[in-house]
């Protein structure tokens, strides 16, 4: 589910997530994890209201990246006839938790990796961890010819114009 709204003070936030957890009781188990705007503390509040809430333990980043990696492999198999990434080129837009986790999974195995982020600090962190990556502007990365384009930024990356420019 998605909850959209303005930032809440702590008391209103607890009430919001408690009410949300109560509302979803009828759907059965609800599997979630901390994500953008959703904290472990929010999940604890939800769990107190609804015992079917799961996802409080473990690092969701690792599992998100692994799920993306498996999806990429399946797509490669479908399109190229092999899930092997060793001869494949990648573009990763966004070097936050997920982008870095994807790099950990493909670095040293992929033929070429091009990355971009609007935060120069994140770019430098990625370059120090993965010295052979190529850095490109966030406004240009979707124009680079690659086998796999992985948008790991906050959103709005793929739209009518950017999709037309994918290579």
Language-model segments: what does each one mean?
Residues 39-40, 99, 122-123, 156-159:
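Flexible loop/turn segments at secondary-structure boundaries
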Residues 17-21, 103, 123, 161-164:
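Short amphipathic alpha-helical segments and helix-helix/interface helices
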């Amino acid at each position: 589910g998605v909850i959209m709204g303005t930032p809440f003070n702590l008391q209103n936030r607890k009430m919001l997530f408690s009410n949300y957890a109560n509302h979803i009781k009828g759907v059965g188990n609800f599997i979630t994890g901390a994500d953008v705007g959703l904290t472990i503390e929010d999940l604890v509040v939800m769990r107190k209201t609804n015992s079917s809430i799961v996802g409080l333990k473990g690092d969701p980043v690792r599992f998100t990246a692994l799920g993306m990696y498996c999806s990429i492999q399946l797509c490669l198999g479908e399109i190229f006839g092999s899930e092997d990434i060793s001869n494949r080129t990648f573009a990763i837009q966004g070097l936050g938790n997920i982008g870095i986790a994807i790099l950990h999974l493909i670095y040293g195995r992929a033929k070429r990796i091009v990355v971009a982020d609007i935060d120069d600090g994140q770019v430098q962190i990625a370059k120090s961890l993965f010295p052979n990556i190529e850095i490109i502007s966030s406004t240009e990365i979707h124009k680079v010819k690659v086998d796999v384009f992985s948008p790991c930024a906050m959103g709005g990356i793929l739209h009518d114009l950017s999709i037309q420019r994918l290579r």
